[in-house]
Amino acid sequence: MKTKTEYRMEKGLHKIAEKIYWNFGDNFGYAFQGAPLTMFVYDFDKDTFHEKEVLKIRLWQDKYHIFKRLPTGNYKTLGATAEADKLYSYIKKACNV
Protein backbone atom coordinates (compact mmCIF):
# COMPACT_ATOMS: atom_id res chain seq x y z
CA MET A 1 0.00 0.00 0.00
CA LYS A 2 1.49 3.33 -1.06
CA THR A 3 1.43 6.33 1.22
CA LYS A 4 -0.02 9.59 -0.07
CA THR A 5 3.50 11.02 -0.38
CA GLU A 6 4.73 8.03 -2.38
CA TYR A 7 1.72 8.20 -4.68
CA ARG A 8 2.07 11.92 -5.34
CA MET A 9 5.83 11.67 -5.94
CA GLU A 10 5.39 8.83 -8.39
CA LYS A 11 2.59 10.72 -10.16
CA GLY A 12 4.82 13.77 -10.49
CA LEU A 13 7.77 11.77 -11.82
CA HIS A 14 5.57 10.11 -14.43
CA LYS A 15 4.72 13.58 -15.75
CA ILE A 16 8.34 14.25 -16.71
CA ALA A 17 9.54 10.69 -17.40
CA GLU A 18 9.06 10.99 -21.16
CA LYS A 19 11.08 14.21 -21.39
CA ILE A 20 14.11 13.10 -19.40
CA TYR A 21 17.07 10.88 -20.13
CA TRP A 22 18.30 9.22 -16.93
CA ASN A 23 21.82 7.89 -16.43
CA PHE A 24 22.28 5.79 -13.29
CA GLY A 25 26.07 5.62 -13.08
CA ASP A 26 28.53 6.57 -10.35
CA ASN A 27 27.11 10.07 -10.52
CA PHE A 28 23.41 10.68 -10.97
CA GLY A 29 22.92 12.83 -14.01
CA TYR A 30 20.32 13.64 -16.59
CA ALA A 31 19.55 15.94 -19.47
CA PHE A 32 16.18 17.60 -19.86
CA GLN A 33 15.06 18.38 -23.40
CA GLY A 34 15.95 21.98 -24.13
CA ALA A 35 17.63 22.53 -20.77
CA PRO A 36 20.56 20.13 -20.20
CA LEU A 37 21.60 19.38 -16.63
CA THR A 38 18.74 21.28 -15.04
CA MET A 39 17.52 20.15 -11.64
CA PHE A 40 13.98 20.32 -10.34
CA VAL A 41 12.15 20.97 -7.10
CA TYR A 42 8.83 19.18 -6.78
CA ASP A 43 6.21 21.29 -5.04
CA PHE A 44 3.62 18.93 -3.54
CA ASP A 45 1.22 21.75 -2.70
CA LYS A 46 1.06 23.01 -6.29
CA ASP A 47 1.74 19.57 -7.83
CA THR A 48 4.39 20.97 -10.15
CA PHE A 49 8.15 21.15 -10.71
CA HIS A 50 10.39 24.21 -10.43
CA GLU A 51 13.82 24.40 -12.08
CA LYS A 52 16.64 24.70 -9.55
CA GLU A 53 20.39 24.08 -9.33
CA VAL A 54 19.84 21.60 -6.51
CA LEU A 55 17.30 18.80 -6.60
CA LYS A 56 15.12 18.98 -3.51
CA ILE A 57 12.32 16.55 -2.89
CA ARG A 58 9.97 17.32 -0.04
CA LEU A 59 9.28 14.19 1.95
CA TRP A 60 6.99 14.40 4.96
CA GLN A 61 7.90 17.67 6.78
CA ASP A 62 11.54 18.05 5.75
CA LYS A 63 13.42 18.85 2.55
CA TYR A 64 16.30 16.54 1.64
CA HIS A 65 19.01 17.97 -0.59
CA ILE A 66 19.88 14.87 -2.58
CA PHE A 67 22.27 16.04 -5.32
CA LYS A 68 24.14 19.20 -6.23
CA ARG A 69 25.72 19.99 -9.59
CA LEU A 70 29.43 20.77 -9.29
CA PRO A 71 31.32 23.30 -11.49
CA THR A 72 32.89 20.34 -13.32
CA GLY A 73 29.45 19.18 -14.41
CA ASN A 74 29.52 16.18 -12.10
CA TYR A 75 27.08 15.61 -9.26
CA LYS A 76 27.86 15.33 -5.58
CA THR A 77 25.68 13.26 -3.28
CA LEU A 78 24.79 15.48 -0.36
CA GLY A 79 23.28 12.78 1.78
CA ALA A 80 22.82 9.03 1.73
CA THR A 81 19.63 8.49 3.66
CA ALA A 82 16.79 6.01 3.63
CA GLU A 83 14.70 8.77 2.06
CA ALA A 84 17.27 9.20 -0.72
CA ASP A 85 17.20 5.45 -1.39
CA LYS A 86 13.42 5.59 -1.67
CA LEU A 87 13.70 8.52 -4.07
CA TYR A 88 16.06 6.60 -6.37
CA SER A 89 13.60 3.71 -6.42
CA TYR A 90 10.66 5.96 -7.30
CA ILE A 91 12.60 7.64 -10.11
CA LYS A 92 13.79 4.34 -11.57
CA LYS A 93 10.27 2.91 -11.44
CA ALA A 94 8.69 6.03 -12.91
CA CYS A 95 11.21 6.06 -15.75
CA ASN A 96 11.03 2.30 -16.33
CA VAL A 97 14.75 1.86 -15.61
Model-found features: residue ranges?
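Intrinsically disordered, low-complexity regulatory segments enriched in Ser/Thr/Pro
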Residues: 47-93, 97
